[in-house]
Amino acid sequence: MTIHKVEGKVYVEFPVAMLGREMLFASSIENTSDGGEGAPGQLGGTDVRFRFEMIDSTLVARMPLLSKPVNTSGDAYIARALDNAHNPGIFKSFKVLACTPDSSALVVDMKGLFLEGSAFTKPFPSTSANGYYGFVSRDHSLQSDKSAILGVSASENHISVCEELSYTVDHTLMGAYNMYKDVPLTAVVTKMLCILPEEPMTPRLADSRLGLTTQLKSDYSGATQEVKSIRYAKRWRIEPSDSAAYRRGELVRPVKQLVFYIDSLMPVKWNPYIKAGAESWNKAFEKIGFKDVICVKEFPKNDTLFNANSFDCMTIRYSASWLNSAQTTIHSDTRTGEILNASILINANMISVQYADRIGATVAIDPRVRTTVFPQEIQGELIQAAIAQAVGTGLGL
């Protein structure tokens, strides 16, 4: 897709060949007036899918249900019944303004999709600091007159719109007590429309005995069977680059490595432990025939094309937040459970909890921790363990 910004409009040359394809909407926060609503670098929002279709001379964005039931019976009548009962609703419509000279693309103004304030496209994660672990709900109201499009860009598989968004936010404690009302919030956000795989990955049923991140589905498995609840495991599409060598039992690299980039704002002394913690998972992948699946790099210094806020880029970011843990955000293809992006946020206050946990667990037997400041060796071990856990979550565990 090609995208243009002209006088505040967002003109997209939408390929006719892309009609009917599934796309994912995602958001990334670049900077904000309140990091408690979402940390810079954090991918927020929900895994909303859109499918674009033509109705007369109008391009419409349909939004399939995230939890559309599946039909494992193979019964054509059940399939038709499910389709009739779950036809995706129209989320936005766009008047076709022109066609490209070769008629291969439709020109539409998509400003209404990117500059809108519904819960489906807002960039703020539910797990941010102002949510106080779920006790406080926040209602964000977009102020369109105080918001603007800053720039647009496109890559091979997605288009991006950078915008400055202003909101008023209401904070409600436990659904009953109004803590704050109309709190002003302004954030620079990149919103992205990403093309999902044309050939969906084969789903894998999750086993409840294993600790996996899952996607809940209802299964209509036949007229004589009850409707069952099943779960798809969220997992990466790890495929061997050399199938013949893989079948011979040799270790092979995957077609696509999982590359994490370390934030340039991260304390430099942490970087070796972050790299060691993330790449420690490669030992597990070797048990199933893969090597060098996970790779950790620092932000490139002289690469003008590198964009840490792109959906194609997985990052390990540093956040000046009181939250006391590492947070992992996963974006997946809700049709199959395929993980498409996993990014990690290291909150500054994580160190305090690591200190308290290590003191409580080992102070009786380890004299090295009987101090107010841990030695670098111990602090590094704790950071390495926290990163290994966060990356494990990003792998779907």
Q: What positions do the PLM features span?
A:
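Auxiliary tRNA-acceptor-end handling modules of aminoacyl-tRNA synthetases
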Residues: 1-266, 284, 288, 299-354, ...
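A generic secondary-structure micro-motif detector
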Residues: 271, 377-378
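Active-site recognition of the HExxH zinc-binding catalytic motif
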Residues: 276-283, 337, 381-397
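Conserved structured catalytic cores and adjacent interaction surfaces
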Residues: 294
